């Protein structure tokens, strides 16, 4: 009888582990929302192109009059400036007036991006922002931005890009997606423990 109970417990643990594995991508991307009119579009750093393309699309569709570009994490300030420059040049070539592009050269992580954007929102009188990033980044962003914006009267909406490499229900099939998911779970644990 005891061995049957042990087998049932092990089977239940295996089912739970498989379920967690199967839904890992969905859990990370679930906080993404639907874009709505806002005061600014924030294109987060570490962008391979999808974030800036999504920000441009939102701008062209009239969701906000400003685009804020954030810096590259863990990079020297001159590298951050160069990184911000290529994204700004892309936007200008696509028709965005340079006066509509703002820069955050000081953020070194998602938490900084949220805090620095909130400070800018307060200074400019913004009420809401659209935060653009990749789908598996959404869960951690919800933690960082939710904490920064809590009780401020300001709103943010997380808007996910649509990268070709991402399939939330089959994330393990793409090496890039698998690396992103594993990295995000490590960072998520860090955020939960630290902040």
Where are the regions that the model predicts?
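A structural signal for short, hydrophobic/glycine-enriched beta-strand patches
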Residues: 23-172
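A transmembrane-helix-recognition feature enriched in membrane-embedded lipid enzymes
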Residues: 173-195
């Amino acid at each position: 009888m005891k061995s049957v109970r042990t087998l049932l417990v092990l089977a239940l643990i295996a089912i739970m582990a498989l379920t967690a594995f199967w839904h890992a991508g969905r859990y990370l991307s679930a906080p993404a929302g639907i874009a709505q009119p806002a005061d600014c579009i924030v294109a987060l750093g570490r962008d391979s192109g999808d974030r800036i393309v999504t920000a441009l699309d939102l701008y062209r569709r009239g969701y906000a009059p400003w685009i804020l570009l954030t810096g590259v994490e863990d990079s020297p300030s001159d590298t951050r400036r160069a990184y911000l420059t290529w994204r700004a040049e892309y936007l200008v070539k696509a028709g965005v007036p340079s006066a509509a592009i703002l820069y955050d050269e000081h953020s070194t992580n998602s938490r900084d991006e949220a805090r620095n954007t909130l400070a800018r929102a307060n200074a400019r009188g913004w009420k809401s922002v659209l935060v653009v990033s990749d789908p598996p980044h959404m869960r951690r962003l919800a933690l960082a931005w939710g904490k920064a914006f809590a009780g401020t009267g300001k709103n943010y909406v997380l808007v996910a890009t649509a990268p070709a490499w991402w399939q939330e229900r089959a994330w393990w099939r793409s090496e890039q997606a698998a690396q992103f998911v594993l990295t995000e779970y490590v960072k998520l644990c860090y955020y939960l423990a630290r902040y």
